[in-house]
Amino acid sequence: MGETIRFGISIDETLLESFDKLIDQKGYMNRSEAIRDLIRASLVELKWEAGEEETVGTVTLVYNHHVRDLSDKLTEHQHTHHDQIISALHVHLDAHNCLEVLVVRGKAREVKQIADELIGVKGVKHGKLVMTTTGEELH
């Protein structure tokens, strides 16, 4: 981690008031912490857009396990990408519906592709990809 640098910014009063409310809601100790998090989030998002950076993501799926062959298709996709899918959690939500959370690691474009494949399987009721960084380059 490098040396901490102080700098000033000019900001509209109304925008600052809204930002201060956000800081309170999220529990930040000060504006600096909130601004650092915003900068980090922007840098992480840029890496996802590039597609070649190593990222980690979670793919969350909700589906009815009674749908014919659906569980088998999802398992087949997971085995196809066993090098990238590093963990899986399966939860029975009720007598019919299951929640599956998969941790996927790889290049951003690969993680997105795997998520799209899984979410696109016929019978998946809801799916969502949440990507983050490996943290290696953030300070």
From Swiss-Prot:
Q: How is the cofactor bound?
A: Binds 1 nickel ion per subunit.
Q: Which InterPro entries match?
A: Acetolactate_synth/TF_NikR_C, ACT-like_dom_sf, Arc_rbn_hlx_hlx, CopG, CopG/NikR_regulator, Ni_resp_reg_NikR, Ribbon_hlx_hlx, TF_NikR_Ni-bd_C
What's in the keyword line of the UniProt record?
A: DNA-binding, Metal-binding, Nickel, Transcription, Transcription regulation
Instruction: Identify the domain of life.
Output: Bacteria
Which residues participate in Ni(2+) binding? H79, H90, H92, C98
Q: Which GO terms describe its molecular function?
A: DNA binding; DNA-binding transcription factor activity; nickel cation binding
Q: Which GO terms describe its biological process?
A: response to nickel cation
Which is a Pfam family this sequence falls into?
Answer: NikR_C
Please give the Gene3D superfamilies that the UniProt record associates with this protein.
Answer: ACT-like. Chain A, domain 2, Met repressor-like
Q: Tell me which cofactor or cofactors this protein depends on.
A: Ni(2+)
UniProt similarity note = Belongs to the transcriptional regulatory CopG/NikR family.
Function field? Transcriptional regulator.
Q: What is this protein called?
A: Putative nickel-responsive regulator
Q: In which organism is this protein found?
A: Geotalea uraniireducens (strain Rf4) (Geobacter uraniireducens)
